[in-house]
């Protein structure tokens, strides 16, 4: 994993099964499918109460049980999907912003959302049908 990582060097504090209650603080891993609604449903079942969701292709995923901020990984997609994306992390490349600065923006947005501000998907009323428990077999 370290060979393929792009930035993070945080210690992995725990590995969890899908929907298992998270008992550790910090960076943990949960086995889940790649399908956005099923993956986030497992995180919510594990106790997650706010989601920081990165996307490079423009997933417009939203969640009602837990607010979901969407972090665009590139500025071109952010510009096309401005109404759906909460943060443009693509500015690290397109505007030469520092990872620290963008990270602070994400952190501050998380604090604001946790304090009652609405995510873009909440403002649009999205997320009613995004609660999808993982079933054994293919998930589509």
Placement of each model-derived feature along the sequence:
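A structural signal for small-residue-enriched, beta-sheet-centric alpha/beta enzyme cores
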Residues: 81-88
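Anionic-ligand anchoring segments at beta-strand to alpha-helix junctions in alpha/beta enzyme folds, i.e.
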Residues: 7-12, 19
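Extended hydrophobic packing segments that form well-structured cores
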Residues: 47-49, 54, 66-68, 89, ...
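Conserved small/polar residues in nucleotide/adenosyl-binding loops
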Residues: 1
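Hydrophobic alpha-helical bundle architecture
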Residues: 15-79, 91-95
């Amino acid at each position: 994993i370290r060979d393929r990582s792009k930035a993070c060097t945080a210690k992995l504090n725990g590995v969890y099964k899908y929907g298992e209650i998270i008992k550790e603080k910090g960076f943990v891993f949960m086995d889940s499918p790649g399908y956005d609604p099923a993956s986030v449903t497992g995180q919510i079942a594990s106790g997650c109460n706010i989601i920081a969701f990165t996307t490079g292709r423009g997933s417009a995923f939203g969640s009602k049980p837990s607010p979901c901020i969407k972090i665009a990984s590139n500025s071109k997609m952010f510009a096309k999907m401005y109404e759906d994306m909460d943060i443009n992390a693509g500015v690290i490349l397109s505007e030469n912003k520092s990872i620290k600065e963008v990270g602070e923006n994400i952190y501050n947005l998380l604090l604001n959302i946790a304090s009652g501000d609405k995510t873009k998907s909440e403002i649009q009323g999205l997320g009613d049908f995004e609660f999808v428990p993982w079933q054994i077999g293919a998930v589509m």
